[in-house]
Every structure is written in structure tokens, then in C-alpha cells.
Amino acid sequence: MTGVQTCALPIYEWLPMLPIARAHGAYLYDVDGRPYLDAISSWWTCLIGHSHPHIVAALKNQLDTLDHVIFGGCTHEPAVALAEKLCALTGLDRVFYADIGSAAVEVALKMSFHYWQNVGQAKKVRFVCLSGSYHGETLGALSVTDVALYRKTYGPILLEPIITPAPDAYQAPAGVSARDFAIMQAGQLEQLLAARSDEICALILEPLVQCAGGMRMYHPVYLERARAACSTHGVHLIADEIAVGFGRTGTMFACQQAGIRADFLLLGKGLTGGVLPLAAVLTTEVVYQAFYASYASQRAFLHSHSFTGNPLVCRAALATLEALEAEDTLNKNRALQVAMAAALAPLSEHPNVAEVRQTGMIIAVELVADKASRSAFDWRERRGLRVYQHGLTRGALLRPLGNVVYLMPPYCITADEIQHLASVITEGIAIAVA
């Protein structure tokens, strides 16, 4: 990489970027051949491992036939087949393609708003999100993101959301179960929708795990109550499963654990096995019909991108879904979930660990300055970064979220590799809190 300037931020002057040359399975390899176990699936995307042979073969074959075509006035087999497969998996009726997760959020927000305009409820212009939520970094997605740094920086140009308290079990008072706390928080949502549904288009949430917000986890009963409240008060429910879909929470989709169907289901990241960018917005026939009208009516949904429905990305997604099914991945993951829990359980006794929490193939360790009070380390001390640095010396790619160290590995990881990562994290925490 001689002559290539990669120092985009001051941190890279003393902590250089990893020059990755290739990847296979659960590993990344730098230009010198050094392996790094990808503990975070390269930002939660490479579900079944890097360079999966079935995906690679499917892409090579697709590239020989159709690489790209405008998706306005044209269609093609990969896009149709993928839409049919996604509808069959989710129980929803219609699919709108986007390229990245943030774009899918934009589509859902616009489509919900536009739906209400088309059916004559023009006062519905507001969105509700959960405290601590994260839905992406385009302007619309940031508008329903409750992260202080983003709102402080971009607040003047963002929409103003209505924020309702999240059911984050970590915040539950002593002696209150995760389920009871979720019901308590759902009660506040129910009151909000009852009072202000005439101005609210939709509630958007991340089912079961608020990932970028610190791997905050909550009980499925909140989703049940949220679905019921939205249905009662005529508000759309947008389920952002971009990070947690396709088995990450233990079921194919997180919403299944609550037995609910959202009005909009957002998918991305692992949809293509992490090979290419693709996102999808699934919705109901009711929503679709609100836009199905003549040109003269001017009721059509207004959203398009140059690479919408690209044949290569659709083929990669189909291959990913085929591999998940053929390899019985979700059933096999049960043993990996047990291995993750067992490997990191000892850390729950550490004096600087407030909690080890897990949902499916996500497990997180919350570092604190004091266990009894759960007082946090000063964010400026960057304790999580110290764990990351140690991981690199031991051939592990971690990416803590502040003081939360987590594993979100590819499904091809082994029990031995999980144990290795647990050892690396344990060592890293000892260094970080010293």
C-alpha cells in the first residue's frame, strides 16, 4: 500500500489502519498474511463468513449474464425471486429495494408519511423513536436517532422526533424483571399514542436489541404491546431489523419472538452475506394499495436510486438465503449461543463488569468504574479502545461501543474460536481497567 494516504483521522497516526488483503470464513488477513478473527462480522454484515463459496459462485455466474439494468420500466429474475422469497419468509406482501440501511429507513419514513397523505390524514407528520435509538446517518435516519453527539452536531437540520423511553433492561430498577420493565415502558408508549396519534405517522424501533446504542437488550413483550398500541391508535410500526435480521437474535427475524408483524420491516447488512450493499423495505398490501393509482392522480411513491434492485446484489442475497437454509444455520447456531454464554459468563463476576447480556448471537459486556453503583467510566478515557488495541495484538478484530465490549461473530465461527475471543476480551479488560 505504498504511496496510499490512509490517515483520515489523527488516531491513525498512532494506531494505523489494518491493511486487509483478503478474507475467508471468520478471518481477515492483512498484507503480511497475519490473520484476524472477525469478532464483529465486519460491522454485522458477514453473517455466514467471508468469501462463502455459494455466494461467490452465484455472483460469478450472474456477472456473466446481467450486471446491471435500470429498475425503472425494467425488471429481472434475481429481483423478482428475492422479493418472493422475502415475502414468504416474513409474511409481508410487498418489497421496495434500497442500497444501504439508512436508505431503507428513509424509504420507510417517507412511505409512511406519504401513505397517510394519500388516505386523507394530512395532520400525521411526526415520528416516534425510542430513547437511545440509532437508525443510520442520513438526515432522515438521524432524525429518528437519539444519540446525543449526532443531535448536538446536526440538530438544527433534523426533523424533531417524539422520543419515548426505551425498555432497555439494563435500566430497570433493582428487583424489577426485564419483562415487567418492558411492560412499564410500553405503558408510556400507549399513553403517548392515545394522546397524540392524530399527528403521528409511525413508531420506529430496533426489535430486541438497540445495537449501535450499546447493545441494549429488552424483553419481547414490549414489541407485543407496541404492536397492539399502534394498531389501536392507527400508527404504523416500523421494525428496523437491519442489524438483527436473519438469525442474529436466535430466530430468523427478531419480531418473530413476539409473534408480531410490523407494517414496515427493514432488512439490510447481512442480507447479502456482507458481500454487497442491499437493503429492503417490506410492507403490507394495504400500504401498497394507497399508492396504486393512475399517473394523473399523482399519488405514486417518490423515491428512486440508480442502483435500485441491482441484479448482482439480489443474486448475492438469494445465495445467502439459500446457504442459510441448506446449512441449517439457525439450528446450528444454538450450540454457538451456548458456547458464547459459557465463555463469557466468568466476566460477570469481574469488579468492573456491570453485566454480561446476550440475545442470540449477540453478547455484550458492560464495563463500569464501579460495579455496585454501575457508575460509568469517563468516555474520554476510551477504555473500550484499549480492549480493541489488545485484540489486535492477539489476532482478534473487536470494535467496542464505548465501554461496551461485544461479540457479534459470523455464524461459521467455532466454539474454540469463541473461547479464544473470550480470553482476548478478558485480557483486554484487565488492561483497560488497570
Region spans (language model):
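Single conserved hydrophobic/aromatic residue that forms the stacking wall/gate
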Residues: 1-7
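Conserved N-terminal phosphate-binding loop of PLP-dependent enzymes in the Aspartate aminotransferase
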Residues: 8-434
